[in-house]
């Protein structure tokens, strides 16, 4: 996430949490653009994506991440008029550009609906406005697309940097917890990079 710095990476159990990555903004901000919010979603779904890359499935330990990511996506579409980020996709031989875009959005939506937390109910003006947003068909569709897009980005990020991520994990297994400047040095040394995602390739799509 741009403008944020990692402050703690831990696998010590705290309050039922089996792992924790903390990142704080370098400067206080009162608003964020869609790209900033999407980066936060990719971060939130990173652990789930890593489980998928390394183990081929996710555990029930991602419940908290799923809940917070769902709330964020719902807030983005319900209160901030946001939708999925722009993306480039190569049409198939019998497709128009619009049809190719719709095909990708449907795959985002399918993935996002599986990720989406739906353990509570509510209306738009009740104590649970997030559930109210998700009860609206159009908003629910957009929230699912955003979640799916963020998860695909997180999955490809981990897959592209798999060896570096594994080195970081091995270091953490030994040390259990890393803080501050030492953590920043470890992450900088890993040289993680964001890949260009080819949505026309099946390799880019996680198996859910």
List each model region and its residues.
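Soluble catalytic regions of large protease machineries
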Residues: 1-208
């Amino acid at each position: 996430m741009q403008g944020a710095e990692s402050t703690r990476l831990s696998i010590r159990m705290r309050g039922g949490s089996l792992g924790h990555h903390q990142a704080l903004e370098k400067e206080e901000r009162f608003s964020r653009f869609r790209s900033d919010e999407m980066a936060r979603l990719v971060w939130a779904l990173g652990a789930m994506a890593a489980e998928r890359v390394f183990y081929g499935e996710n555990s029930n330990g991602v419940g908290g991440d799923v809940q917070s990511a769902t709330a964020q996506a719902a807030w983005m579409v319900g209160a901030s008029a946001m939708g999925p980020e722009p993306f480039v996709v190569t049409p198939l031989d019998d497709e128009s550009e619009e049809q190719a875009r719709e095909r990708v959005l449907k795959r985002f939506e399918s993935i996002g609906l599986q990720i989406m937390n739906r353990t509570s109910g509510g209306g738009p003006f009740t104590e649970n406005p997030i559930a109210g947003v998700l009860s609206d068909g159009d908003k629910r569709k957009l929230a699912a697309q955003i979640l799916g897009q963020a998860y695909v980005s997180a999955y490809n990020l981990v897959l592209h940097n798999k060896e570096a991520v594994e080195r970081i994990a091995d270091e953490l297994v030994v040390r259990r917890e890393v803080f501050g400047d030492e953590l920043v040095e470890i992450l900088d040394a890993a040289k993680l990079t964001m890949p260009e995602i080819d949505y026309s390739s099946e390799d880019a799509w996680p198996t859910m």
